[in-house]
Each structure stands twice: as C-alpha cells, then as structure tokens.
Design a protein with these regions (language model features):
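A short LG(V/I)-centered, amphipathic sequence patch enriched
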Residues: 1-17
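C-terminal effector-binding regulatory domain of bacterial HTH transcription factors
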Residues: 26, 199, 204-207, 215-282
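Short, well-ordered beta-strand segments
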Residues: 54-56, 101, 150, 195, ...
Length: 282
C-alpha cells in the first residue's frame, strides 16, 4: 500500500494475484528461504556444527565406504564441510595436516591421538582368473616360490600380509611393486601375479581367484584417529558417530556379497574350491 502497488485484483472466482503480485511473491519466497537458511546456519554455529573437517584416508577406503558415508552424512548435516584428503601416505595429524584419519593398521602407534575402532580386515592371497589359467594358482605355501609375486612399496611393504607372503619365499624379488592398495588390486586383476588383498574387496570380484585361507596372523584393524583437542567438537563427534556404524554395516554387506560370489563361482566351476592345503598358520 505504501508503494501504491496493486498486488491483488478481484475476479468472478475471488481475489487473485496481479502480475506484480506474482513477481513479488517469487521474490518473497526467496527471502523466506534465505531467512530460513540464515536461521539454520546460526543455530548450527550455536551447536558447534557449522564448519569444516579435514578427513584423510587411503584411496581404497575412500572409494569403498568413506565417500558414500560422507554423502549421506551431509544430507543430514549440510552445514558441515568435509574436505577428503585421499592418500596412501599417512598424514601427520599431530602436526595439523588433517583433523581425522581413517587408517587400517595391525597395531596403533604410540601417540597422544585418540583412536576409535571401526572393523577388522582379513587378508588372503589372490590372483586373476587369467593368471590362474596361464600359470595355475598356487595351491600350497610351498608353491609361492614358483609364482610371480606383487610387492608393496612406501608403506604398503609394511602391511603384515605382505610381509608374511615374502617371508615364505626366502626373499624372492617381486615382479613389480606398488605404493597404493587400490593399485595393488588393479595389478592383480591385470594378471601381473599373486598378492595379499583385503577379503572384503577381493572376494566379491569375479575377476579374482582366492588362493589361500585368511592369513590369521595378518589381520588389520581400521580406526578413526583424531587429536585430543578435537574430541569435544560437536561436528567431529557427529561425523565419527555416523561414520563408524556406517562402515561396520558396509563391511558386513560386502562380506556377505563376497561369500555369495564365491559360492556362485564354485557352482559355475562345477566344484567347490578347496583351500585347506593353503591355510597360513595363525
């Protein structure tokens, strides 16, 4: 009224918006949405939720579970920005290179970092179907010396399952090395040789053949690590409380899928695979 602008006009069926009214209604809805966003952000700041988190993990975990978990988490908490730093080389959390880390290790480092366990990962030896057709799959520990072995480098060589495999072949040189677990999976798929892989990844891959039972002495455990001063930050707590059960459920689903895949493959091959002769000692 103060602008002498007519927003409604009367018709036979009642009042309706004028062209100016329709235009201003759209603008008013934008203002309402902006005000709602402003209020949500202000409340998020009050709760300590708004802000960013720098999370680091290796590529295979990022692709398998962490990225989907982040996507789901942000649908619930859009005010939290998560910067995912994907590298197979461990970043120094205590030096501030990242806020959180998801790492799979056999033993935790002696540090002031807080650790929360996620899941255990079993490893076994695998080769590709193509490699098995060309070279045969190793049937016993003693057979390993006669096969092409893929090694690790720059940290991957310290994975317990990798150490175990090369201990069985008296220092035989690998045909190639990789510093990435994700790339190691691809190298095995490509038929380059035999290597230890996480069962949760490899069992569900129809291109791979499992050569051994699980290497019981080489179980790795994934943890979320964080600096002690971040433990009471609401957005950090919320992410950890979401990520841990998400990854645990994902692991359970993938293991079941892998079990079904191996059973189906055995049925297709006409006989179950007997790994009893290739059972690494505990």
């Amino acid at each position: 009224a103060a602008l002498s602008l007519k927003l409604f006009e009367r018709g036979q069926s009642g009042s309706r918006l004028t062209e100016a009214g329709r235009d201003l209604l759209a603008e008013g809805e934008k203002v309402e949405r902006a005000a709602s966003t402003f209020e949500s952000r202000a409340k998020a700041h009050q709760r300590g939720m708004a802000g960013s988190i720098r999370l680091t993990c290796i590529e295979i975990l990022a692709n398998m579970a962490v990225t989907p978990a982040i996507a789901e988490f942000r649908r619930q908490h859009p005010e939290v920005q998560i910067d995912l730093m994907v590298t197979d080389q461990p970043l120094d959390l205590q030096a501030g290179e990242a806020d959180l880390a998801v790492r799979a290790v056999q033993t935790l480092p002696n540090s002031d970092l807080i650790a929360r366990k996620i899941v255990d990962y079993d490893f076994a030896l695998y080769c590709s179907r193509d490699y098995a057709e060309r070279m045969g799959a190793p049937a016993t520990i003693a057979d390993l010396i006669n096969h092409d072995l893929i090694g690790g480098d720059a940290g991957l060589d310290t994975v317990p399952a990798m150490i175990w495999m090369f201990e069985q072949v008296d220092g035989k040189a690998p045909v190639t090395r990789s510093n990435s677990m994700s790339n190691l999976v691809h190298a095995v798929r490509a038929g380059m040789g035999v290597a230890p892989l996480p069962c949760v990844v490899a069992d569900a891959d129809s291109r791979l053949v499992r050569c051994s039972e699980c290497i019981e002495s080489a179980v790795s455990t994934s943890y979320i690590l964080l600096r002690r001063e971040l433990k009471d930050t609401p957005r950090v707590r919320a992410l950890i409380d979401f990520l841990v059960p998400y990854m645990q459920a994902d692991m359970k689903t993938r293991l079941e899928r892998g079990r079904q895949m191996r059973e189906q493959q055995a049925a297709n091959d006409g006989e179950p695979q007997d790994l009893s002769k290739f059972r690494p000692p505990a």
